[in-house]
Each structure stands twice: as structure tokens, then as C-alpha cells.
Design a protein with these regions (language model features):
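Amphipathic, non-membrane alpha-helical segments in soluble helical-bundle scaffolds
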Residues: 2, 24-27, 31, 199, ...
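Flexible, glycine/charged-enriched surface loops at secondary-structure junctions
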Residues: 22-29, 44-46, 218-227
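Glycine-rich phosphate-binding loops that contact phosphosugars or nucleotide phosphates
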Residues: 39-211
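Generic N-terminal amphipathic, Lys/Arg-enriched alpha-helix
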Residues: 1-21
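Short, glycine-rich nucleotide/cofactor-binding loops
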Residues: 16-26, 106-115
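YjeF_N-associated NAD(P)HX repair module
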Residues: 180-182, 190-253
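A short, well-structured juxtamembrane/interface segment
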Residues: 22-37, 90
Length: 255
């Protein structure tokens, strides 16, 4: 019997390969949309609530990534993500500070796709004329009801949907048999599971998206505004020079 890490490695890589096959056509459609935005001097905005903020941050100020990616950051870390209206106010405040401009792109990330804040941020961005890309688990989204008053999920309000392919509950490795004695709940699952995949696959999908954008920029002979690791000689100066063009538009200051 394989160990738990071996089981995770095998299953997670299967899901990663499936995510590539599922999302490749969507990524191909998105590359020119994001590429044209970058070529015009526009900004790619991201938002993820709760743990999904970690996925969002993967492409913000990232070595090897685009300088023009920035993020809407929730100061409550998702604690009140289901308070109706909070996401709208969060997006509006960010809009006042950094601007959400027509023709730009918002990537909204929510594994469940059911929580209010990502839906409201996406709706605000669409009203401002941005292209909205959702990164979610369609299986998880379909398995749970929406928390938003409209009853809609994130995938319902997006222009394009990327599916991280995570299973409902996110975890994929059976850890131990559940207690099936008389004391066990009648609704207890047959096993406990660990090893979530939404972060692993979500970050991979976003990196595929960034690389597809760079591929389009390269093929169309546009500059490639790629950040360098600040730990390399001369990188800080290089990154600051790139960021000058976006002064006031980036929510995360570069070193």
C-alpha cells in the first residue's frame, strides 16, 4: 500500500494533468485578452478571499511574473466574506485608490465559488467594464448553495471560467477509516481525508495563464515586463524601473 505522500503525489498529478487538458482551450482564449491589456499599459487585478488569497498572491510582485499584476487585498482575511455588501465596498475602495479601468482584467478566485465577497468584487469589476475571469472548482461550486443573496455562484457572473478540478471538500487522500460504531454519526463519511489540491492546481493554472500572456506578447513583438528575483544583482533597480509606468496602480509596492 502506498504511503500517504505517495498517494497524494499520484492523485494530485492526475488532477493537475486533467486541469491542463480542461483549461487549455480557455487559456488560449484568454492569452490575447490579457496580452492586449498589458500591451496597452493596463493592469491585471486579482482577488481571492480567505485561503484563495494565497493563490491570488502567487502572481503579484512575483519573480518571473508580470509587473502589472496587482491585488485587491481583504484586510479581514476573509473573516466577513459572507457579509452582503462587504465585497462591493472592498472593490469600490480599491477602485478609488488604484482604479479599475475598462478593458482591464480581474481574476477572481474562490474554490467554492459560493461566497459573497468574490461574487461582489466580480460584479463591481464587470460594471466598470473589466473582463472577469473566475478561477474556481466547478465540482465544489455545484455541490454547495450560494451564500450570495442573488443565489449566483462566481462562475455565473464571470466572462471566462477556469476550473481547478478540485473535488468537493478539496482533500484527496484517505487517512483512516471513520468510526463506524454505534457512537458514530449516521451522517459520518466513510473516511477522513487530507491533502487539498486547490492551491497546488490553482497556482499552476495562474502560472499557465501568465505564460500564455507572455507568449502572446512575444509573438506580437511587445515588450515583456517581467520581474526579476530581488535577490539577484541589479534586480531591484530593474523592477523599480518597470513599475514606474504603473505608479499609483499597484497595491503592492516593489522593493
Amino acid at each position: 500500500m502506498p504511503s500517504l505522500p505517495e498517494s497524494y503525489f499520484t492523485r494530485a498529478n492526475e488532477l493537475l494533468a486533467r486541469a491542463w487538458a480542461t483549461n487549455a482551450p480557455v487559456l488560449a482564449r484568454l492569452a490575447p485578452i490579457l496580452g492586449e491589456c498589458v500591451a496597452r499599459g493596463g493592469v491585471i487585478h486579482t482577488f481571492g478571499s480567505g485561503h484563495s488569497e494565497l493563490v491570488s498572491r502567487e502572481i503579484i510582485g512575483r519573480a518571473g511574473g508580470l509587473v502589472c499584476v496587482t491585488g485587491i487585498i481583504d484586510p479581514t482575511a476573509g473573516f466577513i466574506e459572507n457579509l452582503p455588501g462587504y465585497g462591493t465596498r472592498l472593490a469600490a475602495r480599491y477602485d478609488r485608490q488604484h482604479q479599475l479601468l475598462p478593458g482591464e482584467v480581474l481574476i477572481a478566485i474562490s474554490n467554492s465559488g459560493k461566497n459573497c465577497s468574490p461574487i461582489e468584487v466580480a460584479l463591481h469589476a464587470r460594471q466598470k467594464g473589466l473582463t472577469v475571469v473566475a478561477l474556481t472548482s466547478l465540482a465544489m461550486s455545484q455541490a454547495t448553495p450560494s451564500e450570495h443573496p442573488s443565489g449566483k455562484k462566481l462562475s455565473d457572473v464571470a466572462d471566462h471560467v477556469l476550473d481547478n478540478g478540485s473535488v468537493p471538500g478539496d482533500a484527496i487522500v484517505e487517512v483512516f477509516p471513520a468510526d463506524l460504531s454505534a457512537k458514530a454519526s449516521a451522517t459520518a463519511e466513510a473516511s477522513a481525508k487530507a491533502g487539498p489540491t486547490s492551491t497546488l492546481i490553482g497556482c499552476s493554472v495562474l502560472n499557465w495563464l501568465m505564460l500564455g500572456t507572455l507568449d502572446w506578447l512575444k509573438q506580437n513583438k511587445h515588450p515583456l515586463p517581467i520581474l526579476r528575483s530581488q535577490n539577484l544583482p541589479g534586480a531591484i533597480e530593474h523592477n523599480r524601473d518597470l513599475a514606474q509606468k504603473y505608479k499609483g496602480r499597484l497595491s503592492r509596492q516593489l522593493a
